[in-house]
């Protein structure tokens, strides 16, 4: 029942165009959740990430388990295709990848612009997330789906051509000069 009250307070993330501001911040989302969700759901939410842990353990949530498996497979497919392009070996953990996943990965790897490649991958991620969207809008899984979608939208909005060029130039210059690169989180 708590999920009903939570979901009814959240603005829709469906159909947002790139020019429209995101109607809720991550902080506000977590604040609302902290007042309504139980401890177990809050613990799951606090661990939720777009990047699955290397050795993730399946959770009680079908959405989180599917997301983590799908993202891991996307990253393994990306590593495999990049390695093939460089004629290198890559351990893809004996996985087979879906045709749509491989099409997205190959399209991204062939892009000249890293930013455009990331857009292709993020579109694929959004399509995948929509494919695992829970049917029950007022469930705990829907809260996790909403959180993943919010994080993905916010991540996609952070891309900026000028900042990307500056970061690329910084990396390139550090390689050419042999200096250690400062990693920013």
What are the roles of these predicted feature ranges?
Residues 1-185:
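Extended alpha-helical surfaces
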């Amino acid at each position: 029942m708590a999920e009903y009250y939570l979901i009814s307070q959240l603005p829709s993330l469906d159909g947002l165009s790139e020019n429209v501001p995101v109607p809720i911040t991550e902080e506000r989302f977590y604040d609302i959740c902290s007042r309504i969700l139980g401890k177990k759901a809050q613990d799951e939410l606090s661990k939720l990430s777009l990047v699955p842990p290397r050795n993730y353990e399946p959770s009680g949530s079908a959405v989180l388990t599917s997301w983590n498996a799908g993202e891991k497979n996307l990253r393994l497919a990306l590593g495999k295709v990049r390695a093939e392009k460089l004629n290198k070996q890559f351990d893809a953990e004996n996985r087979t990848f879906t045709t749509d996943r491989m099409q997205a990965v190959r399209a991204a790897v062939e892009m000249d612009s890293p930013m455009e490649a990331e857009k292709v991958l993020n579109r694929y991620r959004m399509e995948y997330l929509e494919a695992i969207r829970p049917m029950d809008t007022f469930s705990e899984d829907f809260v996790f789906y909403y959180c993943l979608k919010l994080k993905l939208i916010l991540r996609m909005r952070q891309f900026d051509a000028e900042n990307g060029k500056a970061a690329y130039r910084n990396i390139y210059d550090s390689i050419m000069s042999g200096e250690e690169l400062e990693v920013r989180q």
